[in-house]
Regions:
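RNA-binding accessory domains that recognize and position tRNA/RNA substrates
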Residues: 1-36, 46-93, 161
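Active-site adenylate/phosphate-handling loop in enzymes that bind or generate adenylated species
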Residues: 19-32, 103-104, 109-172
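Conserved active-site and cofactor/substrate-binding residues in soluble primary-metabolism enzymes
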Residues: 47, 73-80, 97, 114, ...
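Conserved G/P- and acidic residue-centered "switch" motifs that form tight phosphate/ATP-binding loops
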Residues: 42
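Histidine- and/or cysteine-centered catalytic micro-motif in compact active-site loops
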Residues: 64-65, 99-100, 143-145
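A short acidic, often aromatic-flanked loop/helix-cap motif at beta-alpha or helix-coil junctions
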Residues: 4, 101-104
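Structural beta-sheet core signal
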Residues: 37, 61-63, 96, 141, ...
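Conserved beta-strand termini and adjacent loop/short-helix elements that scaffold enzyme active sites
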Residues: 1, 97-99, 170
Length: 172
């Protein structure tokens, strides 16, 4: 047959439908609230978004662009990633934040040893403001513990202290 039609007869009526299609599993997107995903352009942040969507979280995304330190190609990659995961995360918004001036300010005024953690704290503060304006209840990151030197427990605690929303890290 070209198309299989299924008829389910119940005490109170009948259902007519096509064949079952296996979904991704998990909870319906949006049933667990809404969060802002920090979309970096690497593989970890879209994987984190996918995992949180499977747990029912609706998502928006934020990306920090700082040309000339990051390229236009990197921004296009992030936009493509956001579109790629939309079928799994539901309707989303992508916020691209120009970050060159804050990055240069931190570089010019902070000790080199604190540069990365201060940038992360600054990004978290900005993300926190946007998340609240969008009605989001948490932030999501693709951070992995000790993947890089700045992702230690102490560094994560320092980043967390910069803002007040819960930070969900499904890859840890």
């Amino acid at each position: 047959p070209q198309f299989k039609v299924i008829v389910e007869i119940r005490d109170y009526g009948a259902y007519i439908h096509g064949p079952k299609i296996q979904g991704e599993g998990g909870l319906p997107v949006g049933t667990s609230g809404r969060a802002l995903n920090m979309l970096s352009g690497g593989i970890d942040s879209p994987v984190a978004a996918y995992r949180m969507a499977k747990r029912g979280l609706g998502l928006d995304h934020i990306h920090f662009a700082s040309p000339p330190y990051t390229s236009e190609r990197a921004k296009l990659k992030v936009k493509a990633l956001a579109q790629l995961i939309t079928p799994y995360t539901g309707s989303t918004n992508l916020f691209v934040v120009p970050y060159t001036k804050p990055q240069e300010y931190i570089r010019d005024n902070a000790p080199d040893v604190l540069f990365t953690v201060l940038m992360r704290r600054s990004m978290m503060r900005i993300a926190n403001i946007i998340a609240r304006k969008q009605g989001c209840e948490a932030l999501v990151t693709g951070e992995s513990l000790a993947q890089v030197a700045s992702q230690t427990v102490k560094a994560l605690q320092c980043t967390d202290a910069a803002q007040d929303l819960p930070i969900l890290r499904p890859l840890i």
